[in-house]
């Protein structure tokens, strides 16, 4: 070997008797995957890999490599010296290393090992070419690729004919070689002619060998060669046996390990299958990688042009390569399989530090009823990982938490995820559960279905008010429960009971809450039937009789006040009269006069003092009235059954799903709200108990039932029934019936307001809410509502101007004192708006297994998103100011807005397109045109188009038929005619942002899917496209949403 020298990695090559080998040229000849550790760093030496190098050089099988018993499978050493070598005859590169085993190592050596991983010793400018037969012929020359010649060689003088120049390059041994570089031929090409034949003959190059030209850091032109691997004859055993070489190498390493003495090894990167001296930092990093069977990985391999390529593979086994001689060794402990069939030549066992594990996402195979991927839905935020996004896309009811807790399902409340999946596997369990869920809600949702299906002519924002009060008003019904208890009698006991129940766990609270909820829903349905029948009866009575009865009743009331003493029975009777005022017909039967102040209720009954016992005639009249009420109840039940039969099964299922989802949203309250609900229930139970005590004091339930079920409870409604539409009446009763859910509010029962008085106030216009409730309580409620600035709700004072009666809402004047939601709906700015039907088909289907409703988009039925639309300023209501339009446009705009419901006291729920709970449908099943057909203003369906340097434009994407029309129109708008239509022009790129905020190229998707998914369009220049490819975004320009759509945090709805 000649021209041998040594040079450290850090210092520059030293000058001495012999020239040092250029490090960049050495690494270029060694290969792109070779990286030597720096001197002074810590390395891991594997004797097993060293033996493989010897076996490869001797052309011997690996199974015949002998072992050494006292030598461990690896040694942690310190690299003392490193010398680069090149064979003088073959130019084969190798390195000599001096290692010293260490038991302890300092921090500096560890840092040097880590820094060695970041050093790149490969040359920046080089090219490598495998020689062909013509390149190695004596009469020809070396053909150089054009780009390589222009990059590496000095520029030619093209004024000469032909252009030519002389090149001087040095090899590994610092020998200079001269070549003539000429540009000639047809077609013209770069050739090395003079001097090339001498170089090929001197180096004994053959076809298949490779030649490298590089420019080092000093811009010197260097030349190197790589010889192809060819079978060589094995050395004669008389010269040197392979076993003796193996034993000598292993013995030297074992001696050094026992005595901590230095030993020398030689590493040939072109002959050795793998590196057997690994930086300690690289080894430690690989050990932290958790590998498992089936894991995907990448591995780098060298290409013919001295480049690198990654091949994909799968781990098929983990274990020792040679468990007998090298036990518990990490050398090639992974058995792998390669994806490509051309990779069959590659070895089937690799080491853990040679691979790059691929963290594949966790895919879920959803059941068939889950929604499909297209059309694309707005997803979860960009900062979520792929596992959470997969869960939320496949299982929409999981919301933001998919832990193993009892998640409230949107289809079956109270079922956990495991139970729901088990029911899907067992159709019998699913059928039984569906029947169990349907039964307690059918009665309470009968009129609610009319509210959705039959009231298509009313303003959708009024329906929002009704639904919101249904969710939050606690047990607000006519004549069903005691709405205003006597606080002097019942304050202490509910307070003690609430203290005891607050200590109970949250699980017991939820169970009690569900039980009371089911009971009160059934009771509300019964009372609703009674009140409807009373309302129909009262419509036939003239208004004059009501006035006369009210005046006579007022006179009798004044007389009863003077006769009644202040005892407990009198106070209870006064409470009952305030809650259940008797009708005018009952006053006539009892012989009592009437007065105009009938609506204020009696303050006393002839049951205290001298009037404690009713007369026989009055008792018989009371019994007759009770029988009459029982007959009315039976007829109303029959009428309701006929109404349920007339309703179609899809309508029943749609309304049932909406009600269950509302209850599911309210059941996700935090424990503090649940404790408040328990306190509410305790107060309600005390009220029921006091009512039962009053029934015993009256001597039976007949008289109480007569007073309770009196038709006069609907007397204040008579002035409104003449002008209200039937749909509005049904809606008001639906609000009263559904408001009995105890889980919908945490307000104390004393703050509830009777719906009769609210309806009366809507008609009178001069009465205040303080007529029935103490003024300090109302002041506290208003302070609580106004003290929450985060609700994003506009607290407006209702206008005192005269409003047409068809625009009034019966229950709009009630104040909600719920601490779970704490908002006051403002309906006055939105009275004239109508909402178009959304997704009336292909979104709700019936499961054929049990005829239970299964929806493709469960989240879309939640009214929370539509409530959010009504909460901000009037500027955000532009999406509600039109009649009907194409369903695809409505879906585009709805899905572009992700509403946050934190201000409503429930977890975040994103509003997704697909189906809306506020669809206006007529009895025939067709979309309704709305009540105000004279409004011609349409919703904005336009999509924003932006181009940097130009004013943004808006286009109606639905009026185009294909991509060609869209490109042509956009090019004309922005003055770039002919540059968008030509696919070969690179000046401008047309991209769009979909609902997942992904930036895609216009034209890849089918036109129909593009129209349904486009959110905004941008025209990017070539520089912007390049910047986007580097940064992964639009160069700092945030993607614009659709016109008049809400942003992710609903700030766009603010004025």
UniProtKB/Swiss-Prot annotation:
Function: Auxin response factors (ARFs) are transcriptional factors that bind specifically to the DNA sequence 5'-TGTCTC-3' found in the auxin-responsive promoter elements (AuxREs).
Subunit and partners: Homodimers and heterodimers.
GO CC terms of this entry: nucleus
Biased composition (Polar residues): 757-769
Chain residues forming the annotated DNA-binding region: 127-229
Positions of region (Disordered): 485-510, 532-565, 585-609, 701-720, 732-769, 1034-1055
InterPro entries referenced in this protein's UniProt entry, alphabetically: ARF_dom, ARF_plant, AUX/IAA_dom, B3_DNA-bd, DNA-bd_pseudobarrel_sf, PB1-like
Keywords: Auxin signaling pathway, DNA-binding, Nucleus, Transcription, Transcription regulation
Major location category of this protein: nucleus
Short name of one Pfam family: B3
Keyword ATP-binding attached: no
UniProt biased composition (Low complexity): 488-510, 532-552, 742-756
Originating species: Oryza sativa subsp. indica
Boundaries of every PB1 domain copy: 940-1024
GO MF entries: DNA binding
Protein name, entry field: Auxin response factor 16
UniProt comment concerning the protein's domains: Interactions between auxin response factors (ARFs) and Aux/IAA proteins occur through their C-terminal dimerization domains III and IV.
Entry's transmembrane regions: none
Classification of source organism: Eukaryota, Viridiplantae, Streptophyta, Embryophyta, Tracheophyta
């Amino acid at each position: 070997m000649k021209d041998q020298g040594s040079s450290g990695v850090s210092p520059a090559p030293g000058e001495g008797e012999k020239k040092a080998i250029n490090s960049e040229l050495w690494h270029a000849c060694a290969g792109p995957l070779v990286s030597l550790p720096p001197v002074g760093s810590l390395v891991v030496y594997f004797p097993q890999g060293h033996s493989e190098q010897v076996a490869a050089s001797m052309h011997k099988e690996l199974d015949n490599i002998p072992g050494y018993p006292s030598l461990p499978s690896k040694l942690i050493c310190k690299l003392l010296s490193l010398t680069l070598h090149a064979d003088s005859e073959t130019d084969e590169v190798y390195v000599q290393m001096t290692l010293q085993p260490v038991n302890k190592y300092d921090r500096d050596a560890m840092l040097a090992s880590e820094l060695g991983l970041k050093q790149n010793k490969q040359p920046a400018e080089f090219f490598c070419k495998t020689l062909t037969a013509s390149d190695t012929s004596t009469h020809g020359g070396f053909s150089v690729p054009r780009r390589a010649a222009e990059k590496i060689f000095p520029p030619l003088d093209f004024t000469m004919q032909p252009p030519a120049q002389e090149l001087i390059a040095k090899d590994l041994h610092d020998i200079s070689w001269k070549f003539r570089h000429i540009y000639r031929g047809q077609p013209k090409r770069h050739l090395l002619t003079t001097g090339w034949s001498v170089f090929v003959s001197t180096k004994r190059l053959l076809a298949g060998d490779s030649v490298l030209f590089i420019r080092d850091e000093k811009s010197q032109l260097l030349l190197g060669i790589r010889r192809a691997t060819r079978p060589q004859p094995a050395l004669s055993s008389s010269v040197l046996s392979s076993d003796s070489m193996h034993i000598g190498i292993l013995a030297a390493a074992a001696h050094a390990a026992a005595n901590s003495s230095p030993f020398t090894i030689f590493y040939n990167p072109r002959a050795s299958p793998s590196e057997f001296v690994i930086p300690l930092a690289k080894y430690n990093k690989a050990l932290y990688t958790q590998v498992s069977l089936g894991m995907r990985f990448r591995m780098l391999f060298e290409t013919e042009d001295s480049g690198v390529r990654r091949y994909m593979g799968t781990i098929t086994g983990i274990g020792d390569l040679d468990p007998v001689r090298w036990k518990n060794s990490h050398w090639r402990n992974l058995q792998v399989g390669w994806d490509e069939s051309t990779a069959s030549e590659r070895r089937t066992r690799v080491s853990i530090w040679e691979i790059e594990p691929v963290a594949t996402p966790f895919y879920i195979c959803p059941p068939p009823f889950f929604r499909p991927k297209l059309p694309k839905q707005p997803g979860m935020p960009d900062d979520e990982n792929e596992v959470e996004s997969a869960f939320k896309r496949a299982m929409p009811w999981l919301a933001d938490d998919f832990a193993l807790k009892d998640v409230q399902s949107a289809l079956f409340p109270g079922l956990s995820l495991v139970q729901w999946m088990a029911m899907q596997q067992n159709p019998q369990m699913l059928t039984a559960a569906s029947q169990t869920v349907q039964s307690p809600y059918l009665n309470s949702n009968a009129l609610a279905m009319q509210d959705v299906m039959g009231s298509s002519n009313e303003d959708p924002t009024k329906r929002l008010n009704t639904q919101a009060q249904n969710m939050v008003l606690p047990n607000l019904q006519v004549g069903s429960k005691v709405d205003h208890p006597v606080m002097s009698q019942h304050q202490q006991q509910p307070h003690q009971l609430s203290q005891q129940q607050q200590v109970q766990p949250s699980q017991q609270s939820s169970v009690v809450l569900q039980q009371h909820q089911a009971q009160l829903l059934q009771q509300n349905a019964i009372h609703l039937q009674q009140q409807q029948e009373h309302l129909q009866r009262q419509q036939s009575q003239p208004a004059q009789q009501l006035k006369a009865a009210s005046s006579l009743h007022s006179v009798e009331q004044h007389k009863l006040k003077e006769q009644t003493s202040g005892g407990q029975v009198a106070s209870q009777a006064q409470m009952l009269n305030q809650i259940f005022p008797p009708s005018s017909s009952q006053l006539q039967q009892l012989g009592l006069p009437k007065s105009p102040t009938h609506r204020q209720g009696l303050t006393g009954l002839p049951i205290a003092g001298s009037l404690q016992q009713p007369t026989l005639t009055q008792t018989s009249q009371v019994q007759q009235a009770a029988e009459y009420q029982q007959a009315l109840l039976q007829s109303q039940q029959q009428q309701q059954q006929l109404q349920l039969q007339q309703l179609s099964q899809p309508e029943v299922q749609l309304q049932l799903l909406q009600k269950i989802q509302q209850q599911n949203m309210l059941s996700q309250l935090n424990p503090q709200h649940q404790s408040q609900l328990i306190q509410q229930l305790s107060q309600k139970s005390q009220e029921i108990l006091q009512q039962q005590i009053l029934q015993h004091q009256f001597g039976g339930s007949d008289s109480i039932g007569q007073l309770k079920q009196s038709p006069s409870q609907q007397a204040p409604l008579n002035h409104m029934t003449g002008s209200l539409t039937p749909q509005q009446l049904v809606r008001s009763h639906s609000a009263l019936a559904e408001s009995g859910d105890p889980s919908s509010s945490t307000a104390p029962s004393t703050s509830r307001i009777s719906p009769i008085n609210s309806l009366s106030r809507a008609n009178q216009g001069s009465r205040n809410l303080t007529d029935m409730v103490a003024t300090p309580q109302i002041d506290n409620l208003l302070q609580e509502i106004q003290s929450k600035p985060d609700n994003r709700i506009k607290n407006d004072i209702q206008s005192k101007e005269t409003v047409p009666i068809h625009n009034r809402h019966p229950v709009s004047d009630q104040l909600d004192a719920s601490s779970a939601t704490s908002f006051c709906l403002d309906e006055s700015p939105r009275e004239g708006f109508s909402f178009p039907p959304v997704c009336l088909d292909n979104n709700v289907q019936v499961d054929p297994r049990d005829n239970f409703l299964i929806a493709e988009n469960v989240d879309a039925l939640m009214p929370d998103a539509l409530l959010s639309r009504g909460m901000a300023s009037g500027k955000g209501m532009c999406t509600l100011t039109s009649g009907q339009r194409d369903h695809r446009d409505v879906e585009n705009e709805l899905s572009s807005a992700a509403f946050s419901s934190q201000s409503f006291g429930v977890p975040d729920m994103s509003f997704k397109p697909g189906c809306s709970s506020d669809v206006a449908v007529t009895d025939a099943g067709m979309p309704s045109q709305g009540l105000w057909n004279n409004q011609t203003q349409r919703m904005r369906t336009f999509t924003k188009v932006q181009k940097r340097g130009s004013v943004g434009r808006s286009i109606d994407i639905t009026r185009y038929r294909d991509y060609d029309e869209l490109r042509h129109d956009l090019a004309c708008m922005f003055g770039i005619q002919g540059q968008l239509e030509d696919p070969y022009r690179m000046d401008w790129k047309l991209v769009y942002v979909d609902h997942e905020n992904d930036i895609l190229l216009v034209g890849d998707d089918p036109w129909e899917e593009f129209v349904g998914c486009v959110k905004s369009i941008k025209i990017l220049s070539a520089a912007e496209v390049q910047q986007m490819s580097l940064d992964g975004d639009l160069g700092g320009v945030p993607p614009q949403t659709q016109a008049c759509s809400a942003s992710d945090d609903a700030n766009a709805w603010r004025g």
